């Protein structure tokens, strides 16, 4: 069995509107089944209650999905200027094509974790196929100094079977609690407004994406708003340590 860890139980996601919406019944069932099958596995669910699993009061984690991309180095430059470290959930086939961008992320002091090898929904795979997705990506990432590796399913799509497969392979499934909405935003100001209309609470895991120039533009104000609330910026791994 995995090492003893808390189990996140949130059933709602906080998004750009600042409202909450129930998770689909399938996701709710997955949570209940996984909770009974693997009560010691840590799963951070989309929703404000994800902060229940944070052991570091006052900290907020920035996470970036879908990299590495041609914009990765620009993200890293801005984060360095802001003196902020973040967690990058990377796509395996992109890592294989551009290992130099992965190295740059690590050399910048950031945390890297898996986001699937092909960016297909984990719920579409058999257990054997998902295991291959996890391990192929993991082999391309520097070893993490922790008992369990982090993984974020593409699109946040989970099922009882996928959660079980990830856990048995030694992966902690990490979703998010505050969605920046940058992937659908029309401009940087729209991303920035998310953080004024939905103020981040301690322990929040913020979802952002690579490949979005408007996200790069919004980052200084996003980070500034989080610091103005008294939060320290950390990696997801540090938040859950």
Predicted regions span which residues?
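Short, acidic/turn-prone active-site loops that include or flank metal/cofactor-
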Residues: 90-94, 118, 177-183, 238-239
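C-terminal domain-boundary segment and adjacent tail
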Residues: 42-55, 82-83, 95-96, 214-241
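Histidine-centered catalytic micro-motifs
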Residues: 112-118, 156, 208-211
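Divalent metal-coordination and catalytic microenvironments
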Residues: 65, 79, 88, 112, ...
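Alpha-helical scaffold elements lining the catalytic groove of polysaccharide deacetylases
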Residues: 120-147, 155-202, 214-221
